[in-house]
């Protein structure tokens, strides 16, 4: 058993002394930009989820370097925001010094795992040299009228002392609005807030999704969040008011099934009636704590009759109007036409309120109970009714979006200051000299007043410029601001430790050279937060011609979670968390890296098993023992060895290209078993094997590379080439078995992969029809048999 602690310490020192991971920009090579979602530097340090995600990108980064690409693989720290501030408040520490301590700890941990980051390119969002450009981008948004200060109903969290974006609010099991962080109560409150007009880019954000190699569920979440709908806005005249209620609907063909109208608690009519109706006023007040968001439909279906009627635009019948908590605020017109027979939500509400339910569509999808439109198909009726309403000036064609503008203010201390000052007329002006630095505060706790803690520093707030008194904006930006553009920040650090100006020719050249990010790896939980916001900012910068790509991240991989030994998500409350640092001490970083990659496909969530880690360590001992005790290094190798070695390389590269990292480890195991049988390996073959091993286990690979007397460093070596001619002549017959019964046999090139063999058999229509049934599992014995087990 080798001493991993000594080997890791030795090679960390050598790599540092030779600056092995230093990034060198080379325009003569094809670029590859691989990026991790950068971490929030918590006091707890790295967890296994971090290590798994960062090992994925590290393996891929090393592979592309070995293929001759100019690879950039940076790391930084998302250090502003609520998590750091809340922890600092609870522990009575300054968030700045506390965050810097955590970052140093993170860097030490990241280094111990052997990741190939170049820390010359590292950044933190709390660095004024960095957030200078966060402020610069905001300034440009302001100049483009895409940032404005508005009085708006916001999600106010008393315990956190700040406003939350819609994306940061969840609905708990009782139907109450709560904060995503901490599950604190959230209520509606009208406040003056900065908003960014992300809705301006709604169509561009939708269209861009079709060009991205992202998991389809993530793209669908963004499509649903943007929520583009084409329909009709119909005016229902109120009987006792001059005004009409505008209703957006995508199903005008159901208009004869309307038995009520319902407006949201934020609708102008509900507010107007509440001024003179105490019951309505009480209902609206009660609903402030039960705000419906787009994330989850309301389950209570509460409502109250507004004691007014609307006039049906085609029948002139009177229709009761309700205020209801299931009507989504901010979508369409804040009002719906209730069609209980053809909408689940309307049905629940109608039955609860004992309202009529009128079925206007029969089982053949034709209209009934719809006067002159009876017998028309739903599509025919949709067109005919829409045209009739438009001809009477009672409707118009409309496109609406669920997406709301991004509330960008936070009433907290630990965030980027706005580059804004207000004159004596309360008119906002941009600060020209950036950055506007965040001042130190002794007391940065929110007081619940709605004012930022920065308001307490009057010496900072009040300034005089050209004999005019100004006050600084005291709200700060949300924690998502710095992460909207950090992938550009890394590029701005190339050959400039203080960042190239974002609008400089040097930065533009680097953006043109390295964008888009070729591979982005991170959690699926950021689908409608970071990933949407970053795309929005990037499209704005594209319109300004600062970047030349329409999208920032071309390919996205969501790594699966590492579950606790009990199969549940790791959490301190469950007592099933595992600290990776002691595992490095006991088993070595190489063993942990290998096990995290060998557990299964990178997108799958997998259960931690101590024995799996032990097994991986034993396998590394086998590798070590072969090279130190059993290997006979010679240039004389058999044809069988030549074929086995080239098959190992071919399959390994194929799996690496497909990001099937667990299968690469399987190929290494197969080849090592072969080596133990032959007890021989040439120096060239040793180099090829150790190069692949170095992607996963760089420490041991370096040690064995040195033992063989090969050129240092193995982590800088190019991959060995495959002799593909060997496979053009080497053929073998593979049998296809379905549920254990012979089905067919076919000739294949030796070493063919399972997916290729299966696809080849599927060329036969009869076999393809059978294999299109649900498959339980596939067992493939390479070059011999493939057995497909169908689900019963």
Curated annotation (Swiss-Prot):
What positions does the entry give for ATP binding? 572
What GO MF terms are annotated?
A: aminoacyl-tRNA deacylase activity; ATP binding; leucine-tRNA ligase activity
Q: Where in the cell is it found?
A: Cytoplasm
Q: Which Pfam families match?
A: tRNA-synt_1, tRNA-synt_1_2, tRNA-synt_1g
Q: Does the keyword field hold ATP-binding?
A: yes
Q: Which domain of life is it from?
A: Bacteria
Predominant place of localization: cytoplasm
Keywords (alphabetical) are: Aminoacyl-tRNA synthetase, ATP-binding, Cytoplasm, Ligase, Nucleotide-binding, Protein biosynthesis
Q: What catalytic activity is recorded?
A: tRNA(Leu) + L-leucine + ATP = L-leucyl-tRNA(Leu) + AMP + diphosphate
Q: Which InterPro entries match?
A: aa-tRNA-synth_I_CS (IPR001412), aa-tRNA-synth_Ia (IPR002300), Leu-tRNA-ligase (IPR002302), Leu_tRNA-synth_edit (IPR025709), Methionyl/Leucyl_tRNA_Synth (IPR015413), Rossmann-like_a/b/a_fold (IPR014729), tRNAsynth_Ia_anticodon-bd (IPR009080), Val/Leu/Ile-tRNA-synth_edit (IPR009008)
Q: Which GO terms describe its biological process?
A: leucyl-tRNA aminoacylation
Record Gene3D superfamilies: HUPs, Isoleucyl-tRNA Synthetase, Domain 1
Question: Enzyme group, top EC level?
Answer: ligase
Instruction: Find motif ('KMSKS' region) and give its ranges.
Output: 569-573
EC number(s) reported in the record? 6.1.1.4
UniProt motif 'HIGH' region: location: 39-50
Check the record and name the CDD domains matching this protein: LeuRS_core (cd00812)
A single Gene Ontology CC annotation of this entry is: cytosol
Which protein family is it in?
Belongs to the class-I aminoacyl-tRNA synthetase family.
Which protein are we looking at?
Answer: Leucine--tRNA ligase
Organism this protein belongs to: Mycoplasma genitalium (strain ATCC 33530 / DSM 19775 / NCTC 10195 / G37) (Mycoplasmoides genitalium)
Q: What is the lineage of its organism?
A: Bacteria, Bacillati, Mycoplasmatota, Mycoplasmoidales, Mycoplasmoidaceae
- Tell me the name of the encoding gene: leuS
């Amino acid at each position: 058993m080798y001493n991993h602690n000594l080997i890791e310490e030795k090679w960390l020192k050598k790599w540092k002394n030779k600056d092995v991971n230093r990034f060198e920009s080379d325009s003569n090579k094809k670029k590859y930009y691989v990026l991790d979602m950068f971490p929030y530097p918590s006091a707890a340090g790295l967890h296994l989820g971090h290590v798994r995600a960062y090992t994925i990108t590290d393996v891929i980064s090393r592979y592309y370097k070995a293929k001759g690409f100019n690879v950039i693989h940076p790391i930084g720290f998302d250090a502003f925001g609520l998590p750091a501030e809340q922890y600092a408040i609870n522990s009575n520490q300054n968030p700045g010094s506390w965050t810097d301590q955590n970052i140093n700890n993170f860097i030490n941990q990241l280094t111990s795992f052997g990741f190939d980051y170049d820390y010359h390119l590292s950044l933190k969002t709390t660095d004024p040299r960095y957030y200078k450009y966060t402020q610069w981008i905001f300034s440009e948004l302001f100049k483009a009228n895409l940032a404005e200060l508005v009085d708006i109903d916001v999600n106010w969290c008393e315990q956190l002392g700040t406003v939350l974006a819609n994306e940061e609010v969840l609905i708990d099991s009782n139907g109450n609005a709560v904060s995503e962080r901490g599950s604190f109560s959230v209520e509606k409150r009208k406040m003056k807030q900065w908003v960014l007009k992300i809705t301006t880019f709604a169509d561009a954000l939708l269209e861009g999704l079709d060009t991205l190699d992202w998991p389809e569920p993530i793209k669908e979440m963004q499509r649903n969040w943007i929520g583009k709908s084409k329909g009709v806005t119909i005016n229902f005249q109120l009987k006792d008011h001059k005004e009409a209620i505008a209703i957006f609907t995508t199903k005008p063909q159901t208009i004869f099934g309307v038995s009520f109208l319902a407006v949201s608690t934020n609708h102008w009519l509900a507010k107007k009636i509440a001024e003179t109706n105490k019951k309505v006023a009480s209902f609206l007040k009660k609903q402030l704590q039960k705000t419906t968001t787009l994330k989850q439909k309301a389950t209570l279906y509460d409502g109250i009759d507004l004691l007014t009627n609307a006039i049906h635009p085609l029948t002139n019948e009177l229709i009761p109007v309700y205020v209801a908590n299931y009507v989504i605020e901010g979508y369409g017109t804040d009002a719906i036409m209730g069609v209980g027979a053809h909408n689940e939500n309307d049905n629940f509400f109608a039955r609860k309120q004992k309202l009529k339910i009128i079925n206007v569509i029969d089982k053949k999808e034709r209209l009934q109970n719809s006067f002159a439109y009876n017998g028309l198909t739903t599509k025919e009726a949709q067109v005919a009714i829409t045209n009739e309403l438009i001809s009477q000036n009672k409707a118009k064609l409309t496109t609406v979006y669920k997406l709301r503008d991004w509330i960008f203010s936070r009433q907290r201390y630990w965030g980027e200051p706005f580059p804004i000052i207000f004159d004596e007329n309360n008119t906002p002006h941009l600060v020209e000299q950036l950055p506007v630095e965040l001042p130190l505060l002794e007391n940065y706790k929110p007081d619940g007043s709605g004012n930022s803690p920065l308001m307490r520093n009057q010496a900072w707030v009040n300034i005089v410029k050209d004999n005019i008194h100004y006050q600084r904006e005291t709200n700060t930006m949300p924690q998502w601001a710095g992460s909207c553009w950090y992938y550009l920040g890394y590029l701005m650090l190339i050959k400039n430790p203080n960042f190239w100006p974002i609008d400089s020719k040097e930065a533009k050249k680097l953006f043109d050279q390295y964008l888009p990010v070729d591979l982005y790896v991170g959690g699926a939980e950021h689908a409608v937060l970071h990933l949407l916001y970053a795309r929005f900012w990037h499209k704005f910068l594209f319109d300004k011609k600062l970047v030349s790509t329409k999208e920032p991240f071309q390919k996205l991989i969501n790594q699966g979670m590492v579950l606790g030994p009990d199969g549940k998500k790791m959490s301190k409350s469950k007592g099933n968390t595992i600290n990776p640092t002691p595992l490095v001490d006991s088993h070595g970083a190489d063993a942990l890296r290998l096990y995290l990659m060998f557990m299964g496909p990178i997108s799958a969530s997998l259960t931690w098993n101590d024995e799996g880690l032990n097994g991986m360590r034993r396998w590394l001992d086998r590798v070590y023992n072969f090279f130190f005790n059993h290997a006979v290094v010679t240039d004389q190798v058999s044809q069988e060895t030549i074929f086995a070695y080239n098959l190992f390389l071919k399959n390994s590269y194929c799996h690496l290209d497909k990001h099937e990292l667990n299968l690469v480890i399987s190929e290494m195991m197969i080849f090592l078993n072969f080596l133990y049988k032959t007890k021989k390996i040439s120096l060239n073959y040793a180099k090829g094997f150790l190069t692949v091993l170095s992607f996963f286990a760089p420490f041991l690979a370096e040690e064995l590379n040195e033992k063989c007397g090969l050129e240092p460093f193995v982590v800088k070596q190019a991959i060995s080439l495959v002799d593909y001619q060997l496979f053009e002549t080497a053929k073998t017959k593979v049998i296809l078995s379905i549920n254990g019964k012979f089905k067919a046999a076919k000739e294949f090139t030796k070493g063919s992969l399972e997916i290729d063999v299966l696809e080849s058999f599927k060329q036969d229509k009869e076999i393809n029809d059978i294999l299109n049934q649900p498959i339980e599992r596939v067992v493939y014995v390479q070059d011999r048999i493939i057995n497909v087990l169908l689900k019963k």
